[in-house]
Amino acid sequence: TVVHPHMPDFLALYPEVDVQMRLEDRYMDLIDDPVDLAIRITNHPPPGLMGRHLMDIDHLLCASPQYLARHGTPVHPLELKAHSCIYLGEEPGDAHWKLRSHGKTVTVAVRGRYAANHTGVRLDAVLQHIGIASLPRFTAREALADGRIVQVLPDWSFLPNYSGQLWILHPPTRHLPLKLRVLMDFLAERLGGVDGLQVQRG
């Protein structure tokens, strides 16, 4: 996850604060469920909740240098048809990749022998030279920086079916506990959020 890599530092900075993290695919009801904070990807935070914008989520296509050396580097989206593409695999539309460049959008029906709905699994598949994957930039950042993977079609913007902004949300309250405020501030600083940005919907 995008949050977990930063938690050891948070726990070291605030030894008096305990954290229980729950990874759920289902929608968490912050009013009825016993949850203090939720982190969601959305462009529209739900009405009635308060939240803080942490970061924008963008995606890119990546492959290992070894895979590209063996199979060639695509220079146009349509060339992805000839490659092993690692996609989300939850819905039929996940195998149709959309890319945009200079106002032109191209949709490509891709295929591959491996699909995974977890970004960490797709990254590992790329590192194992299985193919070209769509990855959030925050997932790919470290491997890109050290050269283990490279961006494919860098002149094209990948348009995922699921995108948005990363928000940390909590139920409306006049007095947010200090331990929650420090966690929100910490994550906003680490993930590039705008300091002090608080919104209330509804």
Regions found by a protein language model. Give the residues of each.
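Secondary-structure junction motif
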Residues: 84-103
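Beta->alpha turn/N-cap motifs
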Residues: 25, 41-43, 64-65, 135-138, ...
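Ligand-binding "clamshell"
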Residues: 46-51, 143-154
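A ligand-binding cleft/hinge motif common to bilobed small-molecule-binding domains
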Residues: 125-149
